[in-house]
């Protein structure tokens, strides 16, 4: 029956957790009521959501609700806007936790990593499954720190809608812009939640205006605050002309009253609400033709008579079309406004069937899923999060991975509840699942029921099976994967002893599967292992995880900036490779030209002269492209990747019987020759910087940035603070958080994001090369 009891010590509280082994539904149901009285929970870490709550739910309703009742949503925002606190309140009010988790206390459900609870930030996106008023909500809490942008990208890829959380005193901040652009890329409908309305300096109007100006979005005001900062008491429902007031004597925010606004007691508030509602109706009518016809036809004389349900349906359509964004407000920390936010999620955000995924027509109901996250569990092995787009998943099912062209058997199927999971018999389209047994699958892989299913889908998509067609077929069936950003920092990492090197390699291999933004490579000169990451905090977290999870006390070298290289002029080179292996002669001769690319490009552009035979290219194209990309991995100056270059192959002679490996070796050597002959340029990462500082500290901050080669673009006013926007080289901003704290007595904050790579000045480049090699470089 139950395999084991585990006792968790969370914030010095004794918390029991029941782990369910595989059992049929009837056995689970028979034990639910008995367990209900036996679990002395202060927080619900039960494997089955709702298992110990007063309202014990049917396991059938928990597993597979109708698709129209599913909402796959993410919570996204700038760091410290209140994402995790909002998530914890959602969990509590939906009945899946029995006490309120707090970021400062380190006992939140979705921040389950030790580093997250210590630092009070979210590092990995945690999936949580809950029910709200008959709806299934799969909710993902994402990081707000720029070093963990990939986590945001991973979760947005599989969502149908999102809640953007804003600090009402700050409005749109730097990382908000980043995640908003990511959501735009994936065409995700959003609603906005103006959090921290109780905070000093909170301004509803300012926050709404910043959404309009900075995000270029059209806000639809669905709520008005009753008071601001210390006077914040509740919200007004503009659509229904009702006020929601929370009981000040209630500790958890569950006790609130919804009352119609009356002319007698709420004259000014009612007047303001009617104006806001009329404005909302006009906005929505401009954006939705169906609603415009209704309003102009039946209610042109009096907008007050427009039914709330008609207005809600129109707002839903406008949100789905991403023509505008509904705006709500509240204070998650003070337990106000979260229940209406959940209502808005189910009312205005789309179900999976309302999202247009054109590729689904090719599968005709067969299984199609995307792996968007991989974790490692010491007992279970790799845990793969899947978004199911069509078909049904069951345990012991053999599935085909299109990306890796392999078939694996899924041993177990789980429903995710932060770091707790319940085993289930099946899961259908629209849901997010956690699978055990997929050892080859990595982030971004497309999973189907079988290889024959993939080929059948390709035929339905009208793809031929001519030469090279198979590759195009596979590409046409792949779901858009997760775009992995290039790392900007690197450092060496050493195990405590040579004997521990295999253990370190094993740990890094697992961490890379979990986090594709972490790159690990071997330095060819020193033989050292090199970590490449997205920022100082990213590298620090990886180092800490190796110690905590794998018991390895590793040593990090100095943190260094990941530069790029390029060329400034056009150069030709030739090379011949002539080898005899056994009784076989391998002969390749090539001539190529490298030149600066007309447009910036991370990967070298490859072209072929007309004189290069098409038959020769058919057999060798893959080897040629592999050689060029390999040669560009290490530039001649710093060994950094080469970008913004183009290559033209002018001639290629291959002796009959020559292996493609020799073709690759010859082209790669020829490419390296050309790069060495060209005039070379180092490119450094340029970061966009946003510093929020009080007026009295503005001057020292600006003076310090000037010394760091900073280029100030604009200084904005945000309430009583000043916001400095500009660009600064990454090399100049390392360790900046400590400096900024010192300059401003800890009152300022800053955010960084990679903007582009820019050419270094000759003086700075020479100094860098001297520092790296200890020798003067003549370019």
UniProtKB/Swiss-Prot annotation:
Q: List the catalysed reactions.
A: GTP + H2O = GDP + phosphate + H(+)
What subcellular compartments does it reside in? Mitochondrion
GO CC terms in record:
mitochondrion
Annotated EC: 3.6.5.-
BP-aspect Gene Ontology terms: mitochondrial translation; ribosome disassembly
Keyword Repeat listed? The answer is no
Q: Which UniProt keywords apply?
A: GTP-binding, Hydrolase, Mitochondrion, Nucleotide-binding, Protein biosynthesis
Residues forming coiled coils:
none
Question: Matching CDD domains, A to Z?
Answer: EF-G (cd01886), EFG_III (cd16262), EFG_mtEFG_C (cd03713), mtEFG2_II_like (cd04092), mtEFG2_like_IV (cd01693)
InterPro entries in the record: EF-G-like_DII, EFG2, EFG_II, EFG_III, EFG_III/V, EFG_V, EFG_V-like, G_TR_CS
- Principal cellular location given in the protein's record: mitochondrion
Database matches in SUPFAM superfamilies: EF-G C-terminal domain-like, P-loop containing nucleoside triphosphate hydrolases, Ribosomal protein S5 domain 2-like, Translation proteins
Q: What does this protein do?
A: Mitochondrial GTPase that mediates the disassembly of ribosomes from messenger RNA at the termination of mitochondrial protein biosynthesis. Acts in collaboration with MRRF. GTP hydrolysis follows the ribosome disassembly and probably occurs on the ribosome large subunit. Not involved in the GTP-dependent ribosomal translocation step during translation elongation.
Q: Which PANTHER family match?
A: RIBOSOME-RELEASING FACTOR 2, MITOCHONDRIAL, TRANSLATION ELONGATION FACTOR G-RELATED
* Family assignment from sequence similarity: Belongs to the TRAFAC class translation factor GTPase superfamily. Classic translation factor GTPase family. EF-G/EF-2 subfamily.
Name of the molecule in the record: Ribosome-releasing factor 2, mitochondrial
